[in-house]
UniProtKB/Swiss-Prot annotation:
Compositional bias (Low complexity): 77-89
Subcellular location: Nucleus
Organism: Arabidopsis thaliana (Mouse-ear cress)
Disulphide-bridged cysteine pairs: none
InterPro entries linked to this entry: NPR1/NH1-interacting
Name the UniProt record assigns to this protein: Protein NIM1-INTERACTING 3
Length: 112
């Protein structure tokens, strides 16, 4: 009888150990899932911050500064023609160069 009791007692202990091992594996899996979810949420938050940061600082292209007004386009063309003719017919006089620079009209008004 003692042997049967010991055997039953050993089986109960083995069952309890198996249950404890299962519990620990479930807890370990739950921790890993929580860690994965937290890290993915952190990555999403960082990506959103990066997108917001990019939106705050606009990047300018040379096309942003091209004027579409006909009068300004004519002034730019005249200045380009005068500078090319001045470089072709360079005689060293500063008056001619200063005259070509004063004909250029630039709009420096900033708007938001």
């Amino acid at each position: 009888m003692d042997r049967d009791r010991k055997r039953v007692k050993m089986e109960k202990e083995d069952d309890e150990e198996e249950k404890m091992e299962k519990l620990y594996t479930v807890l370990k899996n739950a921790r890993e899932m929580r860690k994965y979810v937290n890290s993915s949420m952190e990555k999403k938050r960082q990506e959103e911050e990066e997108r917001a940061r990019v939106r705050r600082f606009p990047s300018f292209q040379p096309e942003d500064f091209i004027f579409m007004n006909k009068a300004e386009a004519n002034n730019i063309e005249k200045a380009a023609n005068e500078s090319s003719s001045a470089s072709n017919e360079y005689d060293g006089s500063k008056e001619k160069q200063e005259g070509s620079e004063t004909n250029v009209c630039l709009d420096l008004n900033l708007s938001l």
